[in-house]
Amino acid sequence: MRTLAIFIFTAVAAHADPQLSSWVTEYSSKYARIHRTDAERVSNTTYTTWTNTRLTQALPAYAGIQSITYSDNWIYFNTTDLGPYTMGPWYDNAARTIEFVNLPVNQNINYRIPRTSTLATPPTTKSSMKGPEDAVGFFVDGVALYDPTDGFSYSGGTEASPGTGQWHREAYANEAITFDAGNTHQQNTGKYHNHANPIALRYLLGDHIDLNPTTNTYAESTSAVTKHSPILGWIRDGLPIYGPYGYSSPLDPNSGIRRMVGGFVKRNGATTGVDNITTTGRTALPAWATRNNGNIAASGPAVSTTYPIGRYCEDWAYLGDLIKSGSTKYQLGTDFDLNEYNVRYCVTPEFPNGTYAYFVNLTAAGVPQFPCNTNFYFFGNATGGTATASETVTDYFKGGANVQEIASPPVVDTATGNVTLTWSSIEGGTYQVEASTDLAVWSTLTTTKAAASNAIDTSLVEPGAQATYPKRFYRVKRTALASYDNGTTTTTPGGSEGISSISPASGNRGTTVTLTITLNNSYSMAPPPANVAPTSITLTKNGATTITSATYSRNSSTGVVTASFTLPAGATVGSYTVNASFGPNTWSLTNGFTVN
C-alpha cells in the first residue's frame, strides 16, 4: 500500500542527461490497448486483453517503459514493448478485409545502451544490423526499432527468410499493408516494432503530426515547421534518432528548421548520375552495399511487376557515390543532409555542442523513404543490446505497479464549495481517500475509489467541503491492484497452430529429410489459397542456427507443402519450430520437428 498527501505538490526537474530524460514514462502506469478492426478504431473501441489463438495477452500489461537505471557506462531499461497509444488494427491485404496473423504481446525486455558512443576504427568499418538481435534500438516509448529490411533476401532465384542473399527486401515497400496507424506491426512472437516513421510516437511528442479525431489516424501537419524534432529513440551504438526536422545549417541553431534531405535515390535513371536497373537489370549491387558488406558481389532478379524497383534496399543508390556534373559528385551537406547510414553530425537542442545523430527520412510529401529510420549498418560501435544489469546501478525511474503516485494541489470551486482532488494513479488500482482538519483524526471519504480507466490521473470530488471546513487535509492510499501481466503470463500457444501436422516428425543430423506440411485451415488466420506458393520454409530453435529448406513446393489442389531439408552434421539437437512463410506472414508449429 502507498500513501500520499494531496496537499503536497511535487515538481520533478528534467535530468540534464538526454539519455535519461528523453524517455516517455508518463504512460507507464496505464494499460496497453489495441483496436482489432477499422470500425473499432473509428468508434474508439479498445481492448486490454486479446487473443487470436496464436498470440494471447491474457492479462492487462502496462504500456512501454517500466524501469530505467544507470551506471557510469550504461543506461538500462525494461519495457513491455507495447505502445502507450492505442495500437492496431492490423490487416494483411490492401482491402483491409483479412486480419494480420500476429498480435502484440508483452515482451518484458531488458536492454541497455552505452552512455558514450564510439566510432569504429577505421571509421569506414561498420557492423551490420543483420545479427542475432532483431531490435537495433528502442524508441523512447519503449517500442522496438528495427532496420529497414523485412527479414527476406533474394538468393539463388528465391526469396527466403531468414535469407542469406545480398538483395534485402525493404520493409516499408513490402509490409506497409500490415502496419497500424502508427506505422508499426509485430512479428510471429508478438514483438511490436517499427521500421519507418513512428508517427504515433511523433504525435505524442509534438513532432509536427496531426491526429484526425474522426478516424484516429495520423498525418504530417500541413502547417509550417517551427521547431527541431525531438529525440525519438536510441540506437544500440548509443546515438540518438530524431524525427525528420533539424536545423537548416548543421552547426547553427539559428539557421531555421527544415526537413532533413536523405542521401538515397532510386536506381531508375531519373536522377543525374544514377543507373537504371530496369534496362540494365539487377546485375550489380550499389557501391554503398559492397562497401559495407565486404565487397561481396551478387545479382538480383530482373525488374518486373513481381520484383518492382524499390522492392529491395539495394534498389537505392547513395548520392555521395554518384557524379552530379563532370567529375564532381553530389556533396553531403550541400545536396543532401544524411549520410549512407542516415546520420548527420549537427547541433541539436539536447546536444548544443554537437553529436552524430540518426534522423527519420521522409519525402517532401511526408512518405517514408529508404533507409527510413536507419540503414542496416550501424554508424557507431553497437555495444548495446539485450542485457540485465550485473553491476551496481542507480534508479532513475520506476513505472507500472511500482510507480510512486504524485498529488496535484486541490482545486476549489468557489461557486459550489466543491473540492476536487487529483493524483497520478495506476490503472487497475483501488484507492482509499481520507480527510482531516488537524492531521490527527482522519475520516474516510471512500475505500473503493477505482483508478480512472485509460488515464494516468484519477480525481475525486468532496462536495461543499470549502463551506463546511475552513481547513482541510487529504491523503490517499492505494489499497489494491488488479492482476496484471508482469511478463510471465503472456502465452504463445504451441501444438496445433498455423500448421496442423508434420511428417516425418524427426530426422538425423547429417541426412536429408523431406517434410510434408499440412496447414491448419481452422486456424484464426486461414492459410493462403492452395495455388499460392510459400516464400520460405525454415526450422528454428532458440540458440541454434536456423535450418532453411533449399527446395520446397505446394500442391495447388490440396495446399500441402513439401520441403526438403539438409540437416547439418553439427546441427543442435532437439525440438525445432517449423515455419512456412508466405510473404510477411508465417504459419508455424512449435516443437513440430526434432533433430536427432
What are these regions (language model features)?
Residues 1-7:
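Sec-dependent signal peptide recognition
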Residues 7-16:
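Hydrophobic h-region of N-terminal signal peptides that target proteins for export
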Residues 17-173, 180:
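Solvent-exposed N-terminal domain segments of exported/luminal and surface proteins
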Residues 116, 124-229, 233-239, 245-247:
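Extracellular-facing segments of soluble proteins and assemblies that are Gly/Ser/Thr-biased and enriched
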Residues 190, 354, 429, 472, ...:
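A glycine-anchored, Pro-Gly-centered beta-turn/N-cap motif
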Residues 237-239, 244, 251-405:
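Extended, compositionally biased non-globular segments
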Residues 405-485:
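Short, composition-biased motifs enriched in small/polar/acidic residues
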